[in-house]
Amino acid sequence: RDYAMLLIVARLGIRIGDLCNLKFSNIDWSNQRIDFVQGKTQHRISLPLLKDVGWALIDYIQNGRPKIDTPYIFVTHVAPFKEFDQGNRHSRMVRKYMNLAHLTSVNTHKCGMHSLRHTLASTMVENREKFSNISATLGHRSEDSTAIYLKTGVELLRDCALEIPEV
């Protein structure tokens, strides 16, 4: 479950609230899409069901998910089984795997699930994706909202630098 959840957020930028509310009916396996209404904006969004994300979901559903009757994909693994909520356990999940990977963060309260959205946006900038594509991936209607997520890399800043004429 953890792997599938982390991968979906890292690769697709889905907000944790939308991830917790993801239902089987949101997955269009035939067209390889994930379609849902965002909780924060109430806008419909359609994201590609990337192969690695799809396989992680299949593995979780077939091998890790408790066999319970609920439309929600992600559920708790301790009785009483229910849909996963938006509590702070997600930040603990990220920190747990950071510790296992011997990764450290200067600011531990900024290494939760939401930081994976920031990382995705930064990676898309580094890959020179169009700003409009980044906004669409993050589910933003306004590019102003997307600007908050972008941390421009040093190499990209060097590309913008002007030559200094000799004096």
Language model: regions and residue ranges:
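Conserved catalytic core of the tyrosine transesterase superfamily
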Residues: R1-V167
